[in-house]
Amino acid sequence: MKAAIAQINTAALRHNLAVVKRHAPQCKIIAVVKANAYGHGLLPVARTLVDADAYAVARIEEALMLRSCAVVKPIVLLEGFFSAADLPVLAANNLQTAVHTWEQLEALEQADLPAPVVAWLKLDTGMHRLGVRADEMPAFIERLAKCKNVVQPFNIMTHFSRSDELEQPTTREQIDLFSQLTAPLLGERAMANSAGILAWPDSHCDWVRPGVILYGVSPFPNTVAADYDLQPVMTLKTQLIAVRDHKAGEPVGYGANWVSDRDTRLGVIAIGYGDGYPRMAPNGTPVLVNGRIVPLVGRVSMDMTTVDLGPGATDKAGDEAVLWGEGLPVERVADQIGTIPYELITKLTSRVFMEYV
């Protein structure tokens, strides 16, 4: 019997892609599958999202894995290439690349490639992490437009820094700046991330780039996927391996950081930080057992976690426990732990069995 299982609902993946299309019906879709498809499995997810127009990854290794498994649709490297030595690999595998530094531009100009590559000029409109600044743009695009190793016209993209904060003016300012800077350019444009797709329709350009919403996670604080008709794709579950009577005044686990104030029954579930469940999960973090929410108690161990089933509980070893997913939104769990759902879903270890349904 497998201990920890991440059940991946492929029908939910397709449903969430349909939600994206409903919000941006005139746009082409770049499905973001970086970081092992946000922890959901790169190849199975890409194969499920066959109705996307392209894929985006962060690392060239991810792109090459897709190509080696007969994925032929366009693939965009969101961070671009890291070395001039990568360029022949990009050209040979028909990979598209972001371009955001002078060093990348110089490498493109000097390369000897069998065919030009599709390039996405990444503009810094306010994220201030990657991208060409507005004052650098005229000189940069003059050279990029003349580069023999770039398919012309080149495309343009940017990335939002606060699109999940609807009350902040930053996203509006980024949209306006990007629109102004790119108005004279002929290439295709991409602005909208997950939050942009749902909340900022003015950011819908030729392309949109859904990420976390494809996996049934809300990009906004204090909300859950269902608020936007999204369905959770990952359900992380395990089983009770022991049910024990526990007396008032007794602690449980390393460090004795939880002491029961009543006689109760505790359940031990087969998951821990060795599986990627966060050790920092505090007492009270919700776990779903037999259809009801019970609190995590005691410190998360490498292989086990303890929950308070309550006095007189009839749960037994072998019963299912859900850590997040169907019936227990990952957003709620992340809030309790003090992190973001992105971190939870991307940090599962290889010990967790991936089950696709």
UniProtKB/Swiss-Prot annotation:
One of the record's GO cellular component terms: cytosol
EC numbers on record: 5.1.1.1
Positions of post-translational N6-(pyridoxal phosphate)lysine modification: K34
GO molecular function annotation: alanine racemase activity; pyridoxal phosphate binding
Co-factor(s): pyridoxal 5'-phosphate
InterPro entries named among the record's database cross-references: Ala_racemase, Ala_racemase/Decarboxylase_C, Ala_racemase_C, Ala_racemase_N, Ala_racemase_pyridoxalP-BS, PLP-binding_barrel
Reaction catalyzed: L-alanine = D-alanine
Name of the protein this chain belongs to: Alanine racemase
Species classification: Bacteria, Pseudomonadati, Pseudomonadota, Gammaproteobacteria, Aeromonadales
